[in-house]
């Protein structure tokens, strides 16, 4: 069953990254920990970066769902709490470098999620050129927040952090969220 196998691979990676530096984790280690063959691993993922990024995608997808978050402020609070709770994983994930790095994935997936929410509120229209610039800066800033949070640079609770991050969002996008009809379909 694909769901169980994929979950086993993701869970294996999560166990490994709590005890092992990201750069030292190999596909072979993940396969052994998940008890899957090489062909099974590659049926689901192309490399360890994709496994790591699939974890964050699952977390963001979970919290961005309308039944869990009512707006961007709620989402920021949930993600900050999650990051604080899983600090060790975030710190090790931030060690990844290159095109498929965790940092690049956070930026790209956050940007695409904000774009999807905006399009859902604007009958398919995306960002204005100014909003595109603002969201680009905001999403890059979110990456820096995660990196600094992983290094325990902030002595701040999730609610206060969410308020501060929400205030930094582009004003024209702050109040957009999934429209009611999309929320009821999810």
How would you describe each model-predicted region?
Residues 90-94, 118-122, 149-153, 176:
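Secondary-structure edge/capping motif, primarily at the C-terminal ends of alpha-helices
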Residues 25-26, 91-93, 102, 158, ...:
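Short, hydrophobic secondary-structure boundary micro-motifs
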């Amino acid at each position: 069953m694909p769901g169980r196998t994929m979950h086993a691979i993701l869970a294996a990676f999560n166990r490994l990254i709590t005890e092992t530096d990201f750069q030292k984790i190999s596909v072979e280690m993940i396969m052994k920990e998940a008890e899957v063959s090489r062909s099974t691993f590659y049926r689901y993922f192309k490399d360890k970066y994709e496994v790591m990024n699939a974890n964050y995608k699952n977390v963001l997808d979970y919290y961005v769902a309308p039944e869990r978050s009512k707006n961007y402020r709620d989402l920021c609070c949930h993600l900050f709490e999650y990051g604080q709770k899983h600090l060790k994983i975030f710190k090790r994930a931030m060690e990844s470098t290159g095109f498929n790095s965790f940092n690049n994935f956070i930026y790209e997936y956050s940007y695409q999620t904000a774009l999807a929410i905006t399009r859902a509120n604007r009958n398919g229209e995306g960002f204005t050129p100014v909003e595109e610039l603002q969201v680009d800066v905001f999403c890059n800033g979110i990456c820096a927040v995660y990196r600094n949070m992983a290094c325990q640079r902030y002595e701040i609770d999730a609610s206060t952090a969410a308020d501060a991050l929400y205030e930094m969002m582009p004003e024209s996008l702050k109040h957009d969220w999934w429209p009611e009809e999309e929320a009821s379909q999810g």
